[in-house]
Amino acid sequence: MENITIKINGMEVSAPKGSTILEAARLAHIEIPTLCFLKEINEIGACRICVVEVKGARSLVVSCVYPINEGMEVWTNTPKVLESRRKTLQLLLSNHDRKCLSCVRSGNCELQQLCKELGVTDEGYYDGERTPSVIDDSAVHMIRDNSKCILCRRCSAICEKVQGIGVIGANMRGFATFIGSAFDMGLGETSCVSCGQCIAVCPTGALQEKSQVDEVLAAIADPKKHVIVQTAPAVRATLGEEFGYPIGTNVQGKMAAALRRIGFDKVFDTNFSADLTIMEEAHEFLDRVQNGGVLPLITSCSPGWIKYCEHYFPDMTENLSSCKSPQQMFGAIAKSYYAEKMNLDPKDIVSVSIMPCTAKKFEIQRPDEAANGIPDVDYSLTTRELARMIRKVGLKFTTLPDEEFDAPLGLGTGAAVIFGATGGVMEAALRTAVETLTGEELQNLDFTDVRGMEGIKEATYPVAGLEVKVAIASGLGNARKLLEKVKSGEATYHFIEIMGCPGGCINGGGQPQQPGYVRNSVDIRGLRAKVLYDSDKNNPIRKSHENPAIKELYATFLGEPGSEKAHHLLHTTYVKRKVNEI
């Protein structure tokens, strides 16, 4: 690719033709601040924070969208530039709820951080009329507080361009502009799928999950309740970011230790029920293939994807696996098998999950997720909520010793831990399905064709005389593209894995929020996913059907995969919804 040479702050910089000033500056290790910019998602130059001086230009230019040309001279830190950025921040503050002490994003707010770096304080803002403050808490999973919104449009961009939904966007014009749903509808009245990607990219506290930390702590304090917790595979790969660890650090041991010290009676691993999911899903897949069932079979682990399918592809709900998600399977087993084993009344068990996902808050309230007549899972907290809980009870996370999960629901395999990355469920299922079909042990357990962060992946595997065609999609916009190919007959598959969030659970809507400059320059998904693949590689048991705890569960309680008891506890149903219908 042809390079162009420009000068930035008097220093020559070579950058590919077509680059923006912002991109060229980063090649020179110069960080121009941004608020609205998300690479390839939201490149609109709306916030005006990234302005720079360009020789010959009549005014300051927006560096995130301004292309470079040969011989250009740029200055990023002149008094004029710095003053413009300060005034922009002051204008934003003049229409902003500045109650930082009570804001969930305090200390991790991009607006707050820029004000700190540029010396902007409460005393410098402009007083005057403010847009009306609107709080929308109609959705199960999140709250929208427009008094903290800076109109960066990151949320609407990711909802429309990446997820292909577009239930939030800019309303009205000029000073009256606000971000929200159309026709004054609450988010809970729309076909929002609760994926939380809007929260993940929000630079301020305008969007946040509905926290249940206090309710969980109250349950722990109740001596009549037996409170158990499960942690999803992806959480161990990301929780450390909340406590200063580099992206891509496995903190499984410290996480287990923290949960125990918070006061949970038992600390379990969702990897256990991920293995259980594979046993049921592999059985369902083989049954459909061998007995002429509906194909392709599509995975059901991602509740955001499930709700999306119900809204936008209701005619394909028959393709969905009837298996509950690992979270829900765990809850059902905890309030039946575990309760029986521990001689506990299921009504006295409070089941809590720690998930990378905000859609799990919706999933636990679905009517068919109560196998024992009571909810399978009582509370679902995000990774961020767990971090807040750890701080709230006064634990110093970084100095905690590494501890193990509790038996009997704390043992998981390498196949289970890769559920957290796109392609992981498919790979785990193939390990079990192939060995079941062939009756032979796999020599190579790594199905590398289904790995990687590409939005859509395809592979074909010859198994016992059958060419098994599989596909993987992550991000709902990619799911739509894949399913439209299936519906049109352009592509045929036996098995499809879909995850609602781009990259899978490691990039879930409940994961630690990284600032825009990190999201734009670091392979966050790849680093997080590597934690899971390394964990799989180092696990002595890498196939779900070889998990001894799962074997015991079937031998002593469930019988066999697909049994009547397994169907009652571990399988679910779906509904056909309309767009903008709850």
Stretches found by the model and what they are:
Residues 1-4, 135-136, 176-178, 233-237:
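A short alpha-helix capping/helix-coil boundary motif
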Residues 163, 202, 338-342:
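Structural motif corresponding to the C-terminal cap of alpha-helices
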Residues 4, 12-77, 81-83, 93, ...:
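Iron-sulfur-associated redox domains of electron-transfer enzymes in respiratory
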Residues 48-194, 200, 207-222, 226:
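Fe-S ferredoxin-like electron-transfer domains
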Residues 8:
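Conserved phosphate-binding elements of NTP-dependent enzyme cores
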